[in-house]
């Protein structure tokens, strides 16, 4: 048989029909076998009903996006055929439940193979329509040419806590589905994916990686309010709070969540909260207070489509302006974004370090595509990012204070960063409010002190880009035709587009931005100057990231945008077409 490097499998139907669980079983098994995976769920903002799909890209080498096209489409309804049939590549397969009497007429004369098979009827032979997804799993395994044993072992383990009868019926449903496809295919050969050999890897959500990263950073306190697409961070923390000795507070709203997390930070712990766009709006006043009080808190903002409730289950990168400017006054804070699901783990640890090193709020901004989808990544190194608590004082090192003097918590230092104490430290007493203050934290409205403290709060941020890698550098050309810059989940599609341009002899450099605020203009300028054109790739309608470039960079005329705001992730072709327009 011919060997391939990857394939894309997709299953669709109505929410609540077991589509996600079918995909999860397949993905979990293949991840254990060493395949590199990227999964994507598309679903409506409702509990049950409405069209949904689960797509899985399976590859021999690491993939950073869901890719384009579909090789194997498994459909439980006609809607899936109508909506996604055009994605199926030549030589690909569509299997649809014969119960819906599928219409394949638009595929006549094409090289797409269409099979109408009795998925529901086969499930009912085992006594329940709930087994349709297991029948579909068996069909998929037959199409993909995988060994059945590992899947059957997984099914047996999944239902082991139930009766042996349930286990046997699910195994029979799997065998029936497998047999139907094998009988239909006969001697037809399908390209298969060779076994890569087992790897030391994990398969997890970006949100789970964020939670794991927070734990690795030493955080044991979280206050949050559930919101799509960020809730999984809190759910993971709650699931593991007992073994961690952690405290998780589900508050009544996002304002309370932010203030509660600030309270934990004030008390000396590494506290954080997690939200999405609507919640970030509610946190604006609290974040401004955290900036004034120089409290090192972390806010995870998993970006979704807006404005308002928007499309809560669709991807967008439209919180950039809100993260940078939402808090009132001259707000001093840091905004960073991970470039991959793997970086959700490592960069969130750096977010906690930055917060304490610079004593300010840090907003950590993955997007929905990262937060709610899974990718296989090398097993995390818990020791890669050492904990840095900045100028945290030890009680033994504090000089004696003569009452009623307070500790100079907001001392006007050369680098703008003051020594920090926490409540309870002898000789470390200070005031902390949202009011402008003097060095001891006492309210002060003298013009000179306000200017001095404001300058101090911004002066300390001048070295952020020197102490943090502001972007992922994929720029290999000293002189480039185009520089492409993206953020968050766009990385995979951009890298695939750039790789094709390399093969075509077009010089395209690529940077994936991590540091959004303070904007790393100095570090970006050499790459900017070395390119004839600059294309900013972002998921919003107004070019929010592009505007940051135009505000901060020279030679603005060379900048253009590649915008996408339909709720779907970037693809290689979409990015490539945008680059071609400026060549």
Regions found by a protein language model. Give the residues of each.
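Active-site cofactor/cluster-binding pocket
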Residues: 1-217, 221-223, 533
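Flexible, glycine/charged-enriched surface loops at secondary-structure junctions
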Residues: 40, 150-151, 163-171, 184-193, ...
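Gly-rich Lys/Arg/Thr-decorated short loops/hinges at beta-loop-alpha junctions or inter-strand turns
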Residues: 6, 159, 183-199, 214-219, ...
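A short, gly/pro- and small-residue-rich
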Residues: 83-101, 291-294, 545-563
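Thiamine diphosphate
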Residues: 3-85, 221, 228-325, 334-355, ...
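Flexible, low-complexity linker and terminal segments
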Residues: 203-210, 215, 352-583
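Short gly/pro/ser/thr-enriched loop/turn and capping motifs at secondary-structure boundaries
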Residues: 44-47, 101-104, 122-123, 231, ...
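Short beta-strand segments
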Residues: 75, 97, 118, 275, ...
């Amino acid at each position: 048989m011919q060997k391939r490097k990857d394939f894309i499998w997709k299953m669709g139907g109505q929410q609540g029909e077991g589509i996600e669980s079918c995909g999860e079983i397949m993905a979990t098994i293949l991840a254990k076998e060493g395949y590199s995976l990227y999964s994507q769920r598309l679903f409506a903002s409702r509990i049950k009903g409405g069209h949904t799909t689960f797509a899985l890209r399976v590859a021999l080498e690491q993939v950073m996006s869901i890719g384009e096209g579909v090789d194997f489409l498994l459909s439980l309804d006609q809607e899936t055929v109508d909506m996604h049939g055009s994605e199926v590549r030549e030589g690909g397969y569509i299997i649809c439940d014969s119960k819906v009497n599928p219409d394949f007429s638009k595929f006549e004369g094409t090289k797409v193979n269409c099979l109408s098979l009795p998925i529901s009827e086969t499930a009912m032979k085992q006594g329940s329509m709930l087994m349709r997804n297991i029948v579909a799993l068996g069909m998929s395994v037959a199409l993909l040419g995988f060994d059945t044993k590992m899947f059957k072992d997984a099914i047996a383990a999944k239902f082991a806590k139930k009766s042996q009868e349930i286990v046997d019926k699910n195994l029979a449903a799997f065998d029936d589905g497998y047999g139907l496809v094998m009988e239909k295919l006969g001697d037809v050969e399908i390209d298969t994916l060779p076994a890569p050999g087992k790897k030391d890897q994990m398969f997890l959500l970006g949100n789970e990686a964020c939670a794991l990263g927070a734990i690795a950073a030493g955080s044991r306190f979280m206050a949050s309010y559930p919101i799509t697409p960020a809730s999984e961070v809190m759910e993971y923390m709650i699931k593991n709070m007992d073994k961690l000795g952690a405290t998780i507070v589900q508050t009544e709203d996002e304002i309370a969540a932010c203030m509660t997390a600030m309270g934990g930070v004030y008390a000396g712990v590494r506290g954080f909260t997690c939200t999405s766009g609507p919640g970030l709006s509610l946190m604006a006043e609290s974040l401004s207070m955290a900036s004034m009080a120089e409290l090192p808190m972390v806010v995870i903002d998993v970006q979704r489509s807006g404005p308002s409730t928007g499309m809560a289950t669709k991807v967008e990168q439209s919180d950039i302006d809100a993260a940078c400017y939402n808090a009132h006054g001259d707000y001093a804070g840091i905004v960073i974004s991970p470039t991959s699901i793997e970086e959700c783990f490592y960069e969130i640890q750096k977010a906690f370090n930055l917060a304490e090193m610079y004593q300010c709020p840090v907003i950590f901004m993955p997007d929905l595509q990262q937060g709610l989808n899974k990718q296989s990544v090398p097993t995390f190194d818990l020791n890669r990012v050492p904990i840095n608590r900045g100028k945290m004082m030890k009680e033994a090192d504090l000089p004696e204070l003569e009452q009623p003097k307070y500790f100079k918590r907001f001392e006007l230092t050369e680098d703008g960063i003051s020594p920090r104490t926490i409540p309870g430290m002898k000789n470390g007493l200070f005031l902390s409010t949202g009011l402008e203050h003097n060095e001891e934290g006492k309210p002060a409205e003298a013009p000179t002190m306000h200017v001095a403290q404001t300058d101090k709060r911004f002066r300390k941020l001048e070295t952020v880009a020197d102490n943090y890698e502001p972007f992922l550098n994929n720029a290999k050309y000293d002189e480039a035709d185009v520089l492409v810059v993206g953020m968050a989940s766009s990385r995979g599609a951009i890298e695939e587009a750039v790789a094709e341009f390399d093969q075509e002899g077009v010089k395209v450099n690529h940077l994936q931005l991590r540091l959004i605020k303070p904007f790393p203009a100095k570090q970006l300028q050499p790459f900017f100057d070395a390119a004839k054109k600059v294309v900013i790739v972002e998921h919003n309608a107004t070019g929010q990231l592009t505007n940051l470039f135009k505000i901060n960079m020279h030679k603005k005329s060379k900048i253009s945008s590649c915008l996408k705001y339909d709720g779907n992730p970037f693809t290689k072709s979409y990015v490539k077409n945008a680059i071609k327009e400026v060549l």
